[in-house]
Amino acid sequence: MWLTKSSVGRKVVMSVTGLFLILFITFHAVMNAVALVSMDAYEAICHFLGANWYALAGTAVIAAGVVLHIVYAFWLTIQNRKARGNDRYAVNKRPATVEWASQNMLALGIFVVCFMILHLVQFWAKMQLPEIQEMYLGQYGVDILGGKEAILGAFAQPWTLPIYLVGFAALWFHLTHGIWSAFQSVGTSNNVWLPRWKCVSNWWATIVCGLFAVEAIVFTIMACGCC
């Protein structure tokens, strides 16, 4: 199959799954911003999503996108290293034309995945997962946290904020390269559009990750009872 046997096909899969995940990350940042304005409204959104079939279907699609993106990232990295052979040891420093994020996308991606797992443990495992256990597995008596309770509980921990800020920084680097690279891989980039996509990438990543950072800081202040 072209998508698996061709290096171009594998890059297309990486690009499409990456763009899909970028949209989800953007939605997630905007949804969290609701909690900055009204915790009651945020609770209502969490209750609306919950463990209903459409929320579970969306979760399954997102999980599939993440898995595909990770698998193809390792696949392409191994393929590229085999193609370069010993040449990769010949150069000790990064060429001036190669961005730092570009050269470290796999490492950044691994760090982001570890950060994502922590986030899932702090929120999904305490909100949606218990609902699934109760609604579909008949395991009653499981503690189900609301959105506000989960936020305040997570950010009351002194280590949460610094880890999240480092995670958002890694995500920023990953997105600044990933967005324009994705459009380049699907053939929507040329000498005119490439600088534009790079500009869009920088702005998009800065706005989304900046919003995440502001949310984390405000949630920490709220959890400490300062407001």
Stretch-by-stretch model annotation:
Residues 1-227:
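Membrane-embedded alpha-helical bundles that constitute the cytochrome b-like, heme-associated redox core
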